[in-house]
Swiss-Prot record:
Changing C147S: Reduced levels of expression of GP1 and GP2. Almost complete loss of virus capability to enter into host cell. The gene is GP. The record marks R501, E502, D637, Q638 as: Cleavage. Changing L57A: Complete loss of virus capability to enter into host cell. It comes from Zaire ebolavirus (strain Mayinga-76) (ZEBOV). Changing C608G: Induces GP1 secretion. Complete loss of virus capability to enter into host cell. Residues 54-201 are annotated as: Receptor-binding. Changing D637E: No effect on release of soluble GP1,2delta. This is Envelope glycoprotein. Changing G528R: Reduced infectivity. Keywords: Clathrin-mediated endocytosis of virus by host, Cleavage on pair of basic residues, Coiled coil, Disulfide bond, Fusion of virus membrane with host endosomal membrane, Fusion of virus membrane with host membrane, Glycoprotein, Host cell membrane, Host membrane, Host-virus interaction, Inhibition of host innate immune response by virus, Inhibition of host tetherin by virus, Lipoprotein, Membrane, Palmitate, Secreted, Signal, Transmembrane, Transmembrane helix, Viral attachment to host cell, Viral attachment to host entry receptor, Viral envelope protein, Viral immunoevasion, Viral penetration into host cytoplasm, Virion, Virus endocytosis by host, Virus entry into host cell. Changing N563D: Reduced levels of expression of GP, GP1 and GP2. 20% loss of virus capability to enter into host cell. Changing I170A: 90% loss of virus capability to enter into host cell. The lineage of its organism: Viruses, Riboviria, Orthornavirae, Negarnaviricota, Haploviricotina. Changing N204D: No effect on GP1 and GP2 expression. No loss of virus capability to enter into host cell.
Length: 676
């Protein structure tokens, strides 16, 4: 018995010791005690990458693709400039990739171009490809062009973004935005993070306009599309046009449309009425893009000179029209004009407004400008039928027009947008907001958007101007979400504590620091978002909870990264194409050399001199720049004020785990003492 008891005692103690160790191991696994908790700010990005790969990115289900618009990088968005970035080519099949969320776009495009023989230039959209769902302005271009190729590609290697599908080509009559595709890492797989239902949800006329789905279609006519001699006309109606220039903003075009409409200067003849804007006129009128933080646009619209020419279509001879008779006193605003033969008073307006997803024509537009005409020199132009047309030139004086003020004051740490003028809509007459003078009223076009703070001031307002505010993201509900980063995290990436204004100044010019998604399911699902590469997520507690705020430098850096990566890939594409061409030529040379027909160059001619260019150094420089900007840089030191988020809060999981282990040890000792 004694021997047996002596032998059993170590075995019992061994069992108790083993039980104790297993309890500690189980608690450690349950609470995930971070054995390598980040305790300073000298962490290298490569270390963050190791933590991410080891502990966070455990499944591809954590990756979510997001479309980023090129306009966020500050590219020109006017139609003449944008179309120069597109070109036709043959022999390259289109590619389509999907993405799960996109930004709200300020400018989208829709093309319907025909060849001179009447055939279509662009292919029809395949089944499943729908137009980009969130556009403030849709530039719809119709016309003709040579279209020297089967498909229209992006010359800079970007995608054409459709509804959650990105394609390398443009599809006929389908709205798109220019952009690239980036990726998010979620802290854990969330199947419901992005909504999967179609965005063309049914709506009714009484739906809350704060849903934000409000779009304005602006129509253009193009001749010689895709050539260096392309001419664009802004369409007021089917007979009235304005010669388009790159300096025209969408807001200016809408105000110009309103002025032409209300002044009775639209054509009611069978000929075209084409207006030309004085090159000295300042066209920077109206709202800025919704992501701009500086909205201090204050000036008075003084005057505009518009000249028009009449182009007969042969249905009616209008060469005998008399020129307009105008008042000769430049100091008065009274007119005795007789040009109404060329203008209809009741013809429909051009602007088509997509309100709540449905197209509705603007039934009436009101301008506050005072129109006066003064006699100008008359010229004659031979028409297509060799007839002579009198071409009167009118001067539109808008000196009585309103003084548009858009003060947008921001503090260093604010996240809300301040006052912008309230806009009128097609559902009701304009409401005066500016009271600087007795005659000055709101001169914004009825299609111009208004900020969320002011949309309730206008009766029947069907639009919402989306600003970078937390309140707005809540009002957008299911359709939109502005996602930002924690202030401390933005400092880690962009270099110390900086104000919002300073961060934007040091970032890429006109870079959009805010991402306004249109497929995010809810705010709660956005907890712990992080960008790749090397922007997270949660290196043992850095991104623990909450939406990410003040990520100006972070998002701009991501845009630059995507842009540089795209350029590098474009060089790869060019090198691959040239190598392929060179290989084909070599094959032809070998074939012909065997026939002894005088040699390769004698047979192939100038094509014999083609050789692939070496783009290795260019590509290497781009990759090295990306590594230098985003990989090799260390996370800078943060003060106590900046590092509070990465300070005590990162110890919460560790504290819970340690506390649990201590409780388990105490309980174990109590049980052992009670049992034994």
């Amino acid at each position: 018995m004694g021997v047996t008891g002596i032998l059993q005692l170590p075995r019992d103690r061994f069992k108790r010791t083993s039980f104790f160790l297993w309890v500690i191991i189980l608690f450690q696994r349950t609470f995930s005690i971070p054995l390598g908790v980040i305790h300073n700010s000298t962490l290298q990005v490569s270390d963050v990458d190791k933590l991410v790969c080891r502990d966070k990115l455990s499944s591809t289900n954590q990756l979510r693709s997001v479309g980023l618009n090129l306009e966020g990088n500050g590219v020109a968005t006017d139609v003449p400039s944008a179309t120069k970035r597109w070109g036709f080519r043959s022999g390259v099949p289109p590619k389509v990739v999907n993405y799960e969320a996109g930004e709200w776009a300020e400018n989208c495009y829709n093309l319907e171009i025909k060849k001179p023989d009447g055939s279509e230039c662009l292919p029809a959209a395949p089944d499943g490809i729908r137009g980009f769902p969130r556009c403030r302005y849709v530039h719809k271009v119709s016309g003709t062009g040579p279209c020297a190729g089967d498909f229209a590609f992006h010359k800079e290697g970007a995608f054409f973004l459709y509804d959650r599908l990105a394609s390398t080509v443009i599809y006929r009559g389908t709205t798109f935005a220019e952009g690239v595709v980036a990726f998010l890492i979620l802290p854990q797989a969330k199947k419901d993070f992005f909504s999967s239902h179609p965005l063309r949800e049914p709506v009714n006329a009484t739906e809350d306009p704060s849903s934000g789905y409000y779009s304005t279609t602006i129509r253009y006519q193009a001749t010689g599309f895709g050539t260096n001699e392309t001419e664009y006309l802004f369409e007021v109606d089917n007979l009235t046009y304005v010669q388009l220039e790159s300096r025209f903003t969408p807001q200016f075009l809408l105000q110009l449309n309103e002025t032409i409409y209300t002044s009775g200067k639209r054509s009611n003849t069978t000929g075209k009425l084409i207006w030309k804007v004085n090159p000295e006129i300042d066209t920077t009128i109206g709202e800025w893009a919704f992501w701009e933080t500086k909205k201090n646009l204050t000036r008075k619209i003084r005057s505009e000179e518009l000249s028009f020419t009449v182009v007969s279509n042969g249905a009616k001879n209008i060469s005998g029209q008399s020129p307009a008779r105008t008042s000769s006193d430049p100091g008065t605003n009274t007119t005795t004009e007789d040009h109404k033969i060329m203008a209809s008073e009741n013809s429909s307006a051009m602007v088509q407004v997509h309100s709540q997803g449905r197209e509705a024509a603007v039934s009436h537009l009101t301008t506050l400008a005072t129109i006066s005409t003064s006699p100008q020199s008359l010229t004659t132009k031979p028409g297509p039928d060799n007839s002579t047309h009198n071409t009167p030139v009118y001067k539109l004086d808008i000196s009585e027009a309103t003084q548009v003020e858009q003060h947008h004051r921001r503090t260093d740490n604010d996240s809300t947008a301040s006052d912008t003028p309230s806009a009128t809509t097609a559902a009701g007459p304009p409401k005066a907001e500016n009271t600087n003078t007795s005659k000055s009223t709101d001169f914004l076009d009825p299609a111009t958007t208004t900020s969320p703070q002011n949309h309730s001031e206008t009766a029947g307002n069907n639009n919402t101007h989306h600003q970078d505010t937390g309140e707005e993201s809540a009002s957008s509900g299911k359709l939109g979400l502005i996602t930002n980063t924690i202030a401390g995290v933005a400092g880690l990436i962009t270099g110390g504590r900086r104000t919002r204004r300073e961060a934007i100044v040091n970032a890429q010019p006109k870079c959009n620091p805010n991402l306004h998604y249109w497929t995010t399911q809810d705010e709660g699902a956005a907890i712990g978002l992080a960008w790749i590469p090397y922007f997270g997520p949660a290196a043992e507690g850095i991104y623990i909870e909450g939406l990410m705020h003040n990520q100006d430098g972070l998002i701009c850096g991501l845009r630059q990264l995507a842009n540089e990566t795209t350029q590098a890939l474009q060089l790869f594409l060019r090198a691959t194409t040239e190598l392929r061409t060179f290989s084909i030529l070599n094959r032809k040379a070998i074939d012909f050399l065997l026939q002894r027909w005088g040699g390769t160059c004698h047979i192939l001619g100038p094509d014999c001199c083609i050789e692939p260019h070496d783009w290795t150094k260019n590509i290497t420089d781009k990759i090295d720049q990306i590594i230098h900007d985003f990989v090799d840089k260390t996370l800078p030191d943060q003060g106590d004020n900046d590092n509070w988020w990465t300070g005590w809060r990162q110890w919460i999981p560790a504290g819970i785990g340690v506390t649990g282990v201590i409780i388990a040890v105490i309980a174990l000792f109590c049980i052992c003492k009670f049992v034994f």
